[in-house]
Curated annotation (Swiss-Prot):
LRR repeats lie at residues 94-115, 116-136, 137-157, 158-179, 180-200, 201-221, 222-243, 244-263, 264-284, 285-306, 316-325, 338-357, 359-368, 380-402. GO terms for molecular function: signaling adaptor activity. The modification Pentaglycyl murein peptidoglycan amidated threonine is found at residue 824. PROSITE patterns: GRAM_POS_ANCHORING. One of its GO terms (biological process) is cell adhesion. A motif (LPXTG sorting signal) lies at residues 821-825. InterPro entries: CDIRP, Cu-Rt/internalin_Ig-like, InlJ_EF-hand, InlJ_Ig-like, LPXTG_anchor, LRR_dom_sf, MucBP_dom. This is Internalin J. Disruption phenotype: No visible effect on colonization of host tissue culture cells; decreased organ colonization in mice. Involved in several steps of L.monocytogenes infection by both intravenous and oral infection. Probably acts as an adhesion; upon ectopic expression in L.innocula bacteria adhere better to human cell lines. Residues 786-825 are annotated as: Disordered.
Amino acid sequence: MKTTKIVIASLVSLTMVSNPLLTFAATNDVIDNTTEITTDKETSSTQPTIKNTLKAGQTQSFNDWFPDDNFASEVAAAFEMQATDTISEEQLATLTSLDCHNSSITDMTGIEKLTGLTKLICTSNNITTLDLSQNTNLTYLACDSNKLTNLDVTPLTKLTYLNCDTNKLTKLDVSQNPLLTYLNCARNTLTEIDVSHNTQLTELDCHLNKKITKLDVTPQTQLTTLDCSFNKITELDVSQNKLLNRLNCDTNNITKLDLNQNIQLTFLDCSSNKLTEIDVTPLTQLTYFDCSVNPLTELDVSTLSKLTTLHCIQTDLLEIDLTHNTQLIYFQAEGCRKIKELDVTHNTQLYLLDCQAAGITELDLSQNPKLVYLYLNNTELTELDVSHNTKLKSLSCVNAHIQDFSSVGKIPALNNNFEAEGQTITMPKETLTNNSLTIAVSPDLLDQFGNPMNIEPGDGGVYDQATNTITWENLSTDNPAVTYTFTSENGAIVGTVTTPFEAPQPIKGEDVTVHYLDDKGEKLADDEVLSGNLDDPYTSSAKDIPDYTLTTTPDNATGTFTTTSQSVTYVYTKNIVAAEPVTVNYVDDTGKTLSPSEILNGNVGDTYNATAKQIDGYTLSAEPTNATGQFTSSAQTVNYIYTKNPAPEKGVVEIHYVDEDNKQLNSTTEISGTIGDNYTTEPKTIEGYTLTTTPGNATGTFTTGSQTVTYVYTKNIEAAEPITVNYVDANGKTLAPSETLNGNVGDTYKATAKQIDGYTLSAEPTNATGQFTSSAQTVNYIYTKNTNTDQPLPTKKPTNTTPTKPSNLKTTEVKKASDTLPKTGDSAPWKSALLGVFLSSTALVIWKKKK
């Protein structure tokens, strides 16, 4: 601005000399213009947010467009111009790329004029605000390492690259930037980052925000690099990020990490989380792996043949197998106290080995010729041989237990990079002789050059250099150890040797056994066994035994331990005290008495034994716990509790008595009983029959359902008395010869009637059918004589036509007509004819009279 004013003043002066009138007019114009420019600049510097108002095509200097001189210079440089040069707004809009990083810019006002920008780098300035609302063509934005508290990139829909690392952002909205492939928002104070709309992301870095608790990257299937370390994330799902080759998720609160789908990973840092297990066997491309500061107890790296770096610091690993990791260059197991063994003989490429504070007790380094850095502080190592590690530049084995360092001197590079202070050596325990102890100094105490180290006795010991021994006098077992220190000439090696000691072991005497018996020799209390050294005194003591009184104290109650076993016996007599009774009850589960109680009596301390009873219909539920015990001064009760037996289920057996034709011979018998009980059946004696078949189930067991027992009989063959069949009239007169029927007892007989002329059978006798028996039987067929049909008819008409009841007249059976034709001269036919005529005439006369 000052330059402009000087130029104008010079022009005015020159013009006034040559043409005073013209100069005066021009000077007024120039002064007016200068005043306007000065006013605009001052206004711009005091109010940088107010835009310059120029007409199209008008120009002004970069300093006028951009109030921050540093920013103006950077923009001018982009046009290969000076900040004092003028430029139009249209020209500013043509700039496509601007790199103004590390330029001490504090104000980016004027950036809105650079509407053509596609790439902006304003890294490492002091910018607090950045308005990019007019820079919608931006595809690349790097504004990291500033002091931005807010950044609005929603208008930048073409953005593919965004780096806002190391600012003071508390939120960031990238939902309108779907083309983003790179996003770095690390080292801010974001509490969340939503990248659900940024599916084209290949790199995402949000580490060191410290407050992000959730991160969803499942939509980012193209992601190759992810760094979300130093946050508070508890869950991380990378199963959809199959192209991932670099993952930093260390220093979070992750408890589980599934990497089965991430087989392209070459770099993995999951240290400082809460992982109890992790499976990396699918990650065969892995070259860098850090799982330090996790509570891991197991780790399988056998498939990681390309691994060059492995850190498992401060884990709970019990072991680590490195035999398959032949490309390993860096290995750290610092703080792994539970690892006791480590084999690195297959790791010939090792450059750095750090086993500080590990639990290893030995280490073979003979196959590691490329080893440069070796850290073994605070280990349990007792030996160290680095003679094959000629490239070593740094060795530290402070606070170990190593005596011989002679191999270190073979590597000149270690002379000034070697630390071995604080060695502690514990020697085997020694035995005092007359309270004195002389020990030889360990011949293995050699410095790095193979020389014996300087010895300084402690605890009042005296060192004899000629014999290389140390002697201590008047030692006490109150402090049962002596020490001496060793130091190398250059002081690089310092340590202490401790030798524990003990007094001579005394000779142990044989034990003394103390017995406690009653006057019958029965044991009343547990024996006591006294032990001690030979000739030491012993003292036994009596015991207080309830209900017993000590009656005999042995002579050897006190004495000394000897070379033979001894016995001490205290004898007691039982106190006689009548005890309260023991009542034994027999009840059901409701407390109802089932049988009279029993009362047991005795003296205190005596043993009682209660017994159960057999009670019909009941079963003892359980033996009471106090069925046996001792009488005491208090009354006791023993309860036997019974359960009522359920009603037994019955079975039925039917007994049948039949002949060979299954015909019933006697009534069926039925017996019943409890299922499971035995039954016995008996056959019956049946007259006229003999038992021929006794059934197989004549005896058996009652079962559910009905059973059938069948006895089969055969009829006896016995000639019966005859049966006489008579044919008589009512007076017993024989009308026809009798018939005699014969058969066997039990057989059936059937008598038959006869046709007797002039007689009719009155009735069938009831015993016409029956059975032969051993007694004679008679069957009588009784006949009635037929009425006589040859008597003449009465000629006199009866006067009384009412029939009278016949009296007890004997009926005469009409003689049956002959079945044969009458002979010549017989008169019977005409008599019949006359009788018919007579009857017909009589009937006709009677009929007419009635008419």
